[in-house]
Amino acid sequence: MKFTALLIALGFSLQAGQNAAPSSHLVFDDNFPGDILINEVRVPKAGEAMYTYYETLGWRGRAAGYAGIQAHPKAHNYIFSIWDHKGHTAPIRAVHRGPGTLTEKFGGEGTGLKSWNFTLGWEVDTWYTLVSRCWVMGDHTYYGFWSRSGKTGHWTHLVTMDVAAKEAFFEGGTDAFIEDWLETGKNARTSHLRGGWKRQLNGQWYAFGRAQYSVNYWDLDPGKRSFNFKTNWNGGVAKDATGEYYFMIAGGKATQPTTKNPSQHAIKRTATKPGYAPIKIKSAKVKRDGETLVVEWENDPATLPQFSYKIFYDGIKPRVASGMVPSARRVELPIKQLGRATVHLICEDILGNKSKMYTLNLAGGR
Protein backbone atom coordinates (compact mmCIF):
# COMPACT_ATOMS: atom_id res chain seq x y z
CA MET A 1 0.00 0.00 0.00
CA LYS A 2 2.81 2.35 0.89
CA PHE A 3 4.51 1.59 -2.44
CA THR A 4 1.25 2.18 -4.34
CA ALA A 5 0.69 5.44 -2.50
CA LEU A 6 4.24 6.48 -3.34
CA LEU A 7 3.65 5.77 -7.04
CA ILE A 8 0.44 7.79 -6.99
CA ALA A 9 2.19 10.67 -5.26
CA LEU A 10 5.06 10.54 -7.73
CA GLY A 11 2.64 10.45 -10.64
CA PHE A 12 0.82 13.50 -9.32
CA SER A 13 4.06 15.38 -8.77
CA LEU A 14 5.16 14.62 -12.31
CA GLN A 15 1.91 16.06 -13.69
CA ALA A 16 1.83 19.09 -11.44
CA GLY A 17 3.12 22.24 -13.06
CA GLN A 18 2.22 21.17 -16.62
CA ASN A 19 -1.33 22.51 -16.86
CA ALA A 20 -0.89 26.18 -17.75
CA ALA A 21 -2.28 27.54 -20.99
CA PRO A 22 0.63 28.27 -23.36
CA SER A 23 2.00 31.78 -22.96
CA SER A 24 1.36 33.53 -26.27
CA HIS A 25 2.82 36.73 -27.73
CA LEU A 26 2.32 39.29 -30.46
CA VAL A 27 5.38 41.45 -31.10
CA PHE A 28 4.77 44.47 -33.33
CA ASP A 29 7.06 45.99 -35.94
CA ASP A 30 8.21 49.19 -34.20
CA ASN A 31 11.98 48.94 -33.94
CA PHE A 32 12.67 52.47 -32.72
CA PRO A 33 12.26 54.56 -29.55
CA GLY A 34 9.10 56.57 -28.92
CA ASP A 35 7.22 58.54 -26.28
CA ILE A 36 3.61 57.35 -26.74
CA LEU A 37 2.17 53.83 -27.03
CA ILE A 38 -1.44 52.98 -27.86
CA ASN A 39 -3.26 49.67 -28.23
CA GLU A 40 -6.87 48.55 -28.05
CA VAL A 41 -7.84 45.29 -26.36
CA ARG A 42 -11.04 43.25 -26.17
CA VAL A 43 -11.77 40.01 -24.34
CA PRO A 44 -14.69 38.09 -25.86
CA LYS A 45 -17.02 36.39 -23.40
CA ALA A 46 -15.90 32.95 -24.57
CA GLY A 47 -12.28 34.00 -24.01
CA GLU A 48 -12.63 35.19 -20.43
CA ALA A 49 -10.76 32.94 -17.99
CA MET A 50 -9.86 33.59 -14.37
CA TYR A 51 -6.16 34.03 -13.49
CA THR A 52 -5.35 35.53 -16.90
CA TYR A 53 -3.22 38.54 -17.72
CA TYR A 54 -4.21 40.06 -21.07
CA GLU A 55 -1.11 42.20 -21.50
CA THR A 56 -1.71 44.94 -24.07
CA LEU A 57 1.39 47.14 -24.00
CA GLY A 58 4.91 45.91 -23.28
CA TRP A 59 8.15 47.76 -23.91
CA ARG A 60 11.90 47.48 -23.42
CA GLY A 61 14.46 50.08 -22.37
CA ARG A 62 15.80 51.65 -19.19
CA ALA A 63 12.26 51.82 -17.84
CA ALA A 64 10.95 48.55 -19.27
CA GLY A 65 7.42 47.68 -18.29
CA TYR A 66 3.98 46.49 -19.30
CA ALA A 67 0.31 47.34 -18.99
CA GLY A 68 -2.96 45.55 -19.56
CA ILE A 69 -6.06 44.04 -18.01
CA GLN A 70 -6.54 40.95 -15.87
CA ALA A 71 -9.26 38.50 -14.94
CA HIS A 72 -8.40 38.45 -11.25
CA PRO A 73 -10.33 36.77 -8.38
CA LYS A 74 -10.89 40.21 -6.81
CA ALA A 75 -12.26 41.87 -9.96
CA HIS A 76 -11.52 42.74 -13.55
CA ASN A 77 -8.53 44.99 -13.00
CA TYR A 78 -5.97 47.17 -14.76
CA ILE A 79 -2.25 46.80 -14.19
CA PHE A 80 0.72 49.01 -15.05
CA SER A 81 4.25 48.10 -13.97
CA ILE A 82 7.80 49.36 -14.49
CA TRP A 83 10.95 47.40 -13.64
CA ASP A 84 13.93 48.70 -11.73
CA HIS A 85 17.08 49.23 -13.79
CA LYS A 86 20.70 49.48 -12.73
CA GLY A 87 20.80 52.95 -14.28
CA HIS A 88 18.09 54.35 -12.00
CA THR A 89 19.40 56.78 -9.38
CA ALA A 90 16.40 56.41 -7.04
CA PRO A 91 13.44 54.03 -6.51
CA ILE A 92 10.46 54.31 -8.85
CA ARG A 93 7.60 56.22 -7.22
CA ALA A 94 4.01 57.11 -8.02
CA VAL A 95 3.38 60.85 -8.36
CA HIS A 96 -0.31 60.42 -9.21
CA ARG A 97 -2.80 57.68 -8.37
CA GLY A 98 -6.22 57.85 -9.97
CA PRO A 99 -9.35 56.91 -7.97
CA GLY A 100 -9.03 53.29 -6.86
CA THR A 101 -5.41 52.89 -8.00
CA LEU A 102 -3.03 51.19 -5.58
CA THR A 103 0.74 50.90 -5.95
CA GLU A 104 3.22 48.48 -4.43
CA LYS A 105 6.73 47.17 -4.93
CA PHE A 106 7.04 43.81 -6.65
CA GLY A 107 9.66 41.08 -6.80
CA GLY A 108 10.07 37.66 -8.37
CA GLU A 109 10.78 38.26 -12.05
CA GLY A 110 12.86 41.34 -11.32
CA THR A 111 11.84 44.20 -9.03
CA GLY A 112 9.98 47.43 -9.60
CA LEU A 113 6.74 49.32 -8.96
CA LYS A 114 3.32 47.92 -9.81
CA SER A 115 -0.05 49.67 -9.92
CA TRP A 116 -3.43 47.95 -9.61
CA ASN A 117 -6.96 49.27 -10.13
CA PHE A 118 -9.80 46.95 -9.16
CA THR A 119 -12.54 49.61 -9.03
CA LEU A 120 -12.68 50.96 -12.59
CA GLY A 121 -13.42 47.54 -14.07
CA TRP A 122 -13.73 46.27 -17.62
CA GLU A 123 -16.38 44.21 -19.42
CA VAL A 124 -16.17 41.37 -21.91
CA ASP A 125 -17.03 42.06 -25.56
CA THR A 126 -15.97 45.70 -25.16
CA TRP A 127 -12.97 47.43 -26.69
CA TYR A 128 -10.67 49.33 -24.32
CA THR A 129 -7.97 51.75 -25.43
CA LEU A 130 -4.82 51.74 -23.31
CA VAL A 131 -2.32 54.59 -23.65
CA SER A 132 1.03 55.21 -22.00
CA ARG A 133 3.06 58.36 -22.49
CA CYS A 134 6.51 59.16 -21.13
CA TRP A 135 8.08 62.60 -20.82
CA VAL A 136 11.28 64.07 -19.47
CA MET A 137 11.13 65.92 -16.14
CA GLY A 138 14.63 67.22 -15.38
CA ASP A 139 16.90 64.20 -14.91
CA HIS A 140 13.89 61.89 -14.57
CA THR A 141 11.29 60.42 -16.92
CA TYR A 142 7.60 60.29 -16.02
CA TYR A 143 5.27 57.57 -17.27
CA GLY A 144 1.49 58.08 -17.42
CA PHE A 145 -1.19 55.44 -18.02
CA TRP A 146 -4.74 56.02 -19.30
CA SER A 147 -7.71 53.87 -20.32
CA ARG A 148 -10.77 54.53 -22.48
CA SER A 149 -13.94 52.45 -22.37
CA GLY A 150 -15.47 51.74 -25.76
CA LYS A 151 -18.84 51.46 -24.02
CA THR A 152 -18.93 54.87 -22.32
CA GLY A 153 -16.31 56.66 -24.41
CA HIS A 154 -14.82 58.07 -21.21
CA TRP A 155 -11.12 58.29 -20.42
CA THR A 156 -9.50 57.62 -17.04
CA HIS A 157 -6.03 58.59 -15.80
CA LEU A 158 -4.94 55.64 -13.67
CA VAL A 159 -1.38 56.41 -12.61
CA THR A 160 1.79 58.41 -13.25
CA MET A 161 5.18 57.03 -12.20
CA ASP A 162 8.50 58.84 -11.75
CA VAL A 163 11.54 56.94 -13.06
CA ALA A 164 14.94 58.30 -11.98
CA ALA A 165 16.52 58.08 -15.43
CA LYS A 166 16.69 60.81 -18.06
CA GLU A 167 15.17 60.20 -21.50
CA ALA A 168 14.16 56.61 -20.73
CA PHE A 169 11.82 56.21 -23.69
CA PHE A 170 9.78 53.25 -24.97
CA GLU A 171 11.99 50.88 -26.94
CA GLY A 172 10.52 48.48 -29.51
CA GLY A 173 9.19 46.17 -30.45
CA THR A 174 6.03 46.66 -28.49
CA ASP A 175 4.41 43.39 -27.44
CA ALA A 176 1.19 41.92 -26.14
CA PHE A 177 0.74 38.53 -24.49
CA ILE A 178 -1.63 36.16 -22.73
CA GLU A 179 -0.48 34.61 -19.47
CA ASP A 180 -2.22 31.94 -17.38
CA TRP A 181 -0.64 32.41 -13.96
CA LEU A 182 -2.40 29.59 -12.08
CA GLU A 183 -2.39 26.54 -14.36
CA THR A 184 -5.96 26.71 -15.62
CA GLY A 185 -5.13 25.66 -19.15
CA LYS A 186 -8.39 23.72 -19.47
CA ASN A 187 -10.06 27.11 -19.93
CA ALA A 188 -9.51 28.93 -23.21
CA ARG A 189 -8.55 32.58 -22.92
CA THR A 190 -8.69 34.96 -25.87
CA SER A 191 -7.31 38.42 -26.55
CA HIS A 192 -8.28 40.71 -29.44
CA LEU A 193 -5.99 43.62 -30.34
CA ARG A 194 -6.26 46.46 -32.84
CA GLY A 195 -5.47 50.13 -33.45
CA GLY A 196 -1.89 50.04 -32.20
CA TRP A 197 0.25 53.17 -32.55
CA LYS A 198 3.61 54.50 -31.46
CA ARG A 199 4.77 58.10 -31.64
CA GLN A 200 8.37 58.48 -32.73
CA LEU A 201 10.62 60.98 -30.99
CA ASN A 202 10.32 63.32 -34.00
CA GLY A 203 6.55 63.52 -33.46
CA GLN A 204 5.60 61.24 -36.36
CA TRP A 205 3.02 58.50 -35.79
CA TYR A 206 3.66 54.86 -36.69
CA ALA A 207 0.80 52.38 -37.04
CA PHE A 208 1.37 48.76 -35.99
CA GLY A 209 0.87 47.13 -39.38
CA ARG A 210 2.61 43.81 -38.75
CA ALA A 211 3.09 41.46 -35.83
CA GLN A 212 4.85 38.19 -35.08
CA TYR A 213 2.74 35.65 -33.24
CA SER A 214 4.52 33.04 -31.13
CA VAL A 215 4.06 30.63 -28.25
CA ASN A 216 6.75 29.89 -25.65
CA TYR A 217 7.98 26.64 -27.22
CA TRP A 218 10.20 25.86 -24.22
CA ASP A 219 7.06 25.52 -22.08
CA LEU A 220 5.62 22.79 -24.33
CA ASP A 221 8.16 20.05 -23.56
CA PRO A 222 7.50 17.17 -21.11
CA GLY A 223 7.67 18.37 -17.53
CA LYS A 224 7.26 22.02 -18.51
CA ARG A 225 4.41 24.31 -17.44
CA SER A 226 2.24 23.95 -20.59
CA PHE A 227 3.00 20.38 -21.67
CA ASN A 228 -0.57 19.12 -21.19
CA PHE A 229 -1.84 21.87 -23.51
CA LYS A 230 1.08 21.90 -25.93
CA THR A 231 -1.18 21.93 -29.01
CA ASN A 232 -3.93 24.16 -27.64
CA TRP A 233 -3.06 27.59 -29.01
CA ASN A 234 -3.81 29.79 -32.00
CA GLY A 235 -3.28 33.31 -33.30
CA GLY A 236 -3.49 35.54 -36.33
CA VAL A 237 -5.90 38.06 -37.86
CA ALA A 238 -9.69 37.90 -37.78
CA LYS A 239 -12.54 40.21 -38.78
CA ASP A 240 -15.98 41.11 -37.48
CA ALA A 241 -18.39 44.05 -37.77
CA THR A 242 -15.84 46.32 -36.06
CA GLY A 243 -13.13 45.50 -38.62
CA GLU A 244 -9.90 43.49 -38.58
CA TYR A 245 -8.01 42.67 -35.42
CA TYR A 246 -5.19 40.46 -34.19
CA PHE A 247 -6.17 37.58 -31.94
CA MET A 248 -4.53 35.08 -29.61
CA ILE A 249 -6.13 32.02 -28.01
CA ALA A 250 -4.37 30.01 -25.30
CA GLY A 251 -5.63 26.85 -23.62
CA GLY A 252 -8.87 24.91 -23.93
CA LYS A 253 -8.78 21.37 -25.32
CA ALA A 254 -10.85 22.42 -28.35
CA THR A 255 -8.32 25.05 -29.39
CA GLN A 256 -6.14 23.98 -32.31
CA PRO A 257 -3.54 25.97 -34.26
CA THR A 258 -4.26 27.19 -37.78
CA THR A 259 -0.86 28.85 -38.08
CA LYS A 260 2.79 28.15 -37.35
CA ASN A 261 4.80 28.97 -34.24
CA PRO A 262 6.14 31.56 -34.92
CA SER A 263 4.22 33.21 -37.75
CA GLN A 264 3.84 36.66 -39.30
CA HIS A 265 0.55 38.53 -39.62
CA ALA A 266 -0.50 41.91 -40.97
CA ILE A 267 -3.39 44.38 -40.98
CA LYS A 268 -3.39 47.14 -43.59
CA ARG A 269 -3.48 50.57 -41.92
CA THR A 270 -4.49 53.67 -43.88
CA ALA A 271 -4.84 56.30 -41.13
CA THR A 272 -1.83 58.54 -40.53
CA LYS A 273 -2.56 59.30 -36.87
CA PRO A 274 -4.91 58.19 -34.07
CA GLY A 275 -8.49 59.39 -34.50
CA TYR A 276 -9.66 60.01 -30.93
CA ALA A 277 -11.58 63.20 -30.17
CA PRO A 278 -9.10 65.92 -29.06
CA ILE A 279 -9.30 67.50 -25.63
CA LYS A 280 -12.15 69.92 -24.92
CA ILE A 281 -12.36 72.20 -21.89
CA LYS A 282 -15.88 71.70 -20.53
CA SER A 283 -15.94 74.59 -18.06
CA ALA A 284 -13.61 76.94 -16.20
CA LYS A 285 -13.75 79.69 -13.61
CA VAL A 286 -11.46 82.28 -12.11
CA LYS A 287 -11.59 84.04 -8.77
CA ARG A 288 -9.53 86.29 -6.56
CA ASP A 289 -8.41 85.00 -3.17
CA GLY A 290 -6.51 87.81 -1.50
CA GLU A 291 -3.41 88.37 -3.61
CA THR A 292 -3.82 85.05 -5.39
CA LEU A 293 -5.54 84.33 -8.68
CA VAL A 294 -7.25 80.92 -8.66
CA VAL A 295 -8.10 79.23 -11.96
CA GLU A 296 -10.10 75.98 -11.99
CA TRP A 297 -11.38 73.96 -14.91
CA GLU A 298 -12.99 70.70 -15.99
CA ASN A 299 -12.42 68.77 -19.21
CA ASP A 300 -14.88 66.67 -21.20
CA PRO A 301 -14.17 63.02 -20.17
CA ALA A 302 -15.22 61.83 -23.64
CA THR A 303 -12.28 63.70 -25.18
CA LEU A 304 -8.59 62.87 -24.91
CA PRO A 305 -7.16 63.39 -21.41
CA GLN A 306 -5.06 66.38 -20.46
CA PHE A 307 -1.29 66.23 -20.60
CA SER A 308 -0.38 69.87 -19.90
CA TYR A 309 -1.89 73.32 -19.40
CA LYS A 310 -0.96 76.93 -20.08
CA ILE A 311 -2.56 79.97 -18.46
CA PHE A 312 -2.11 83.53 -19.72
CA TYR A 313 -2.93 86.33 -17.28
CA ASP A 314 -3.50 89.59 -19.16
CA GLY A 315 -3.71 92.16 -16.41
CA ILE A 316 -1.70 95.01 -14.92
CA LYS A 317 1.36 92.77 -14.85
CA PRO A 318 0.89 89.97 -17.43
CA ARG A 319 2.00 86.49 -16.43
CA VAL A 320 2.13 83.00 -17.87
CA ALA A 321 1.85 79.77 -15.89
CA SER A 322 2.26 76.31 -17.39
CA GLY A 323 2.90 72.74 -16.36
CA MET A 324 3.14 69.17 -17.66
CA VAL A 325 0.77 67.90 -14.98
CA PRO A 326 -1.97 65.66 -16.42
CA SER A 327 -3.96 65.67 -13.17
CA ALA A 328 -3.92 69.46 -12.61
CA ARG A 329 -7.33 71.15 -12.61
CA ARG A 330 -6.53 74.07 -10.33
CA VAL A 331 -3.71 76.60 -10.49
CA GLU A 332 -2.93 79.44 -8.10
CA LEU A 333 -0.98 82.48 -9.32
CA PRO A 334 0.36 84.98 -6.76
CA ILE A 335 -0.46 88.40 -8.21
CA LYS A 336 -0.33 91.47 -5.97
CA GLN A 337 -2.15 93.89 -8.27
CA LEU A 338 -5.38 92.12 -9.17
CA GLY A 339 -7.39 94.61 -11.15
CA ARG A 340 -9.60 94.01 -14.15
CA ALA A 341 -8.01 91.30 -16.25
CA THR A 342 -8.51 88.57 -18.81
CA VAL A 343 -7.37 84.99 -18.29
CA HIS A 344 -6.82 82.55 -21.15
CA LEU A 345 -6.53 78.78 -20.65
CA ILE A 346 -5.22 76.25 -23.17
CA CYS A 347 -4.78 72.51 -22.51
CA GLU A 348 -2.82 69.96 -24.52
CA ASP A 349 -3.94 66.34 -24.52
CA ILE A 350 -1.85 63.18 -24.18
CA LEU A 351 -1.55 62.80 -27.96
CA GLY A 352 -0.38 66.37 -28.55
CA ASN A 353 -3.60 68.10 -29.61
CA LYS A 354 -4.32 71.57 -28.21
CA SER A 355 -7.73 72.66 -26.96
CA LYS A 356 -9.51 75.79 -28.07
CA MET A 357 -8.59 78.78 -25.93
CA TYR A 358 -10.97 79.27 -23.01
CA THR A 359 -11.27 82.94 -22.01
CA LEU A 360 -12.33 84.21 -18.59
CA ASN A 361 -12.84 87.79 -17.45
CA LEU A 362 -11.91 88.97 -13.98
CA ALA A 363 -13.71 92.13 -12.90
CA GLY A 364 -11.84 94.76 -10.92
CA GLY A 365 -12.24 94.72 -7.15
CA ARG A 366 -13.18 91.05 -6.92
Question: What are the roles of these predicted feature ranges?
Answer:
Residues K310-Q337:
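Recognizes extended acidic, P/S/T-rich segments that occur
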Residues G17-G34, E40-M50, E183-W297, L304:
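Activation corresponds to long, low-complexity, non-globular regions
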Residues L351-G365:
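Extracellular fibronectin type III
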Residues I335-K354:
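Beta-strand-rich modules
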Residues G17-L102, N117:
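Secretory/extracellular carbohydrate-interaction modules
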Residues W122-H157:
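Carbohydrate-binding surfaces in secreted/extracellular proteins
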Residues F106-W127:
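Short, aromatic/His-centered strand-loop micro-motif at the edge of beta-sheets
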Residues D300-F312:
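Solvent-exposed loop/turn segments flanking beta-strands in beta-repeat/beta-sandwich domains
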